[in-house]
Amino acid sequence: MAANDRATTPGKSGQGTGNEALMRASLSAVAPGMALRDGLERILRGNTGGLIVLGMDKTVESMCTGGFVLDVEFTATRLRELCKLDGALILDKDMTKILRAGVQLVPDASIHTEETGTRHRTADRVSKACGFPVVSVSQSMRLIALYVDGERRVLEESSAILSRANQALATLERYKLRLDEVAGTLSALEIEDLVTVRDVTAVAQRLEMVRRIATEIAEYVVELGTDGRLLSLQLDELIAGVEPERELVVRDYVPEPTAKRSRTVAEALTELDALSHTELLELPVVARALGYSGSPETLDSAVSPRGFRLLAKVPRLPGAIIERLVEHFGGLQKLLAASVDDLQTVDGVGEARARSVREGLSRLAESSILERYV
């Protein structure tokens, strides 16, 4: 089949996160191993075309002329046979029933489309008009195209997707290895109270790079369906804890608000997410996203963590207790210097928990120093 096509054209409202969620759900429905994908492959092998709307409402009904009402259970073989007829098929949104067959769809001709073939133009316009996914099977080009609210995605063979996914997975493994190195260095520097803005931005940069490549691989997993099971397991193992770590680093180091500069944790995470791939490679730009000025002098200036990240590594320590400990002591160095009695002064921290925190922090401090110098 043809290469993956990710071209996007302006559509109706519902773009952004909602549109991405609909595309992901639609790709899952047509992924290998699903009954709908089996039916679409049968249409291709039979050298016929097809136009299938994955949902029915008054808007879709208003575009339908001719054809006949079926309301029968969906099967891959029925889909194949009914696509021999001229016209489109209408399925229910759960894709469990074939509602109509042989339908001529007449969408508003004023809806913009950049497609050229009649079937593809109709599919694009119908998806934009009704908001339901529409699948177009091209007989001449032998490809399956999915249209979701202005976005077109060409479905590929699993082998082609797996090839790209394995390359991305190898990249993720390298990124994760480098992330572990800089995160370990940061932990040791935190214990010694020698952290600079440069050290923090290096970790934030690597966390964001890992998150982005993982998101790309997750899309491949969706497109692969049952063929992506092993890839999904590998991905889950590699990125375990990355997303919480990303937030913890920002919570530890986002600057205190001032009259000139103020940034919340959520804003800093959003700024990091908004950086282009080129911007992400520049440490000063990453520093600005975190709320620092980004100047060379700032990158080398000393900063101290609040302690969220290290406390999160202490076993069986609830988030609410971590919040209270950070608020009470105000920084990691004071936490490291606190005795069991000092820790017990915090609301909700009894003797047993205080000893657990004290011992946990001591073990983390020792292991971090050993990893760096041994």
UniProtKB/Swiss-Prot annotation:
Catalytic activity, as annotated: 2 ATP = 3',3'-c-di-AMP + 2 diphosphate
Documented EC number(s): 2.7.7.85
Keyword set, alphabetical order: ATP-binding, DNA damage, DNA repair, DNA-binding, Magnesium, Nucleotide-binding, Nucleotidyltransferase, Transferase
Binding-site residues for ATP, renumbered to this chain: 87, 105, 118-122
GO molecular function term, any single one: DNA binding
DAC domain sequence ranges: 20-158
One record GO biological process: DNA repair
Entry-linked Pfam families: DAC, DisA-linker, HHH_5
Cofactor requirement: Mg(2+)
HAMAP family: DisA
Function: Participates in a DNA-damage check-point that is active prior to asymmetric division when DNA is damaged. DisA forms globular foci that rapidly scan along the chromosomes during sporulation, searching for lesions. When a lesion is present, DisA pauses at the lesion site. This triggers a cellular response that culminates in a temporary block in sporulation initiation. Also has diadenylate cyclase activity, catalyzing the condensation of 2 ATP molecules into cyclic di-AMP (c-di-AMP). c-di-AMP acts as a signaling molecule that couples DNA integrity with progression of sporulation. The rise in c-di-AMP level generated by DisA while scanning the chromosome, operates as a positive signal that advances sporulation; upon encountering a lesion, the DisA focus arrests at the damaged site and halts c-di-AMP synthesis.
Description of how the protein assembles with itself and partners: Homooctamer.
The family this protein is said to belong to: Belongs to the DisA family.
Protein name: DNA integrity scanning protein DisA
Organism: Streptomyces griseus subsp. griseus (strain JCM 4626 / CBS 651.72 / NBRC 13350 / KCC S-0626 / ISP 5235)
